């Protein structure tokens, strides 16, 4: 059976959670995941937030992300702390307009539990 393709959508402030969810979806559901990719802080000239804006390519990256949604069987919204930013809201609307099913992290108790447990373990 062909694996489903999942496009991860969410704020770059949740890139760490996005990476964990990508791993869990691939491990537990056999899905292929696509999402945003951030450069590490040690990469020359990387600002703390919004690299695409700093490099003047935000519009290009936003458009590319919509193409990822076009390829996806569903989107998975990383709405940690119930936060959905402007870009993510546009991606959700785009998915709705194009009939792409939408899942939300906050509605996925097994993944929420995993993230909460992992965060708690990291603090101990």
Placement of each model-derived feature along the sequence:
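Conserved catalytic or regulatory cores that recognize and/or transform ribose-phosphate-containing ligands
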Residues: 1-124
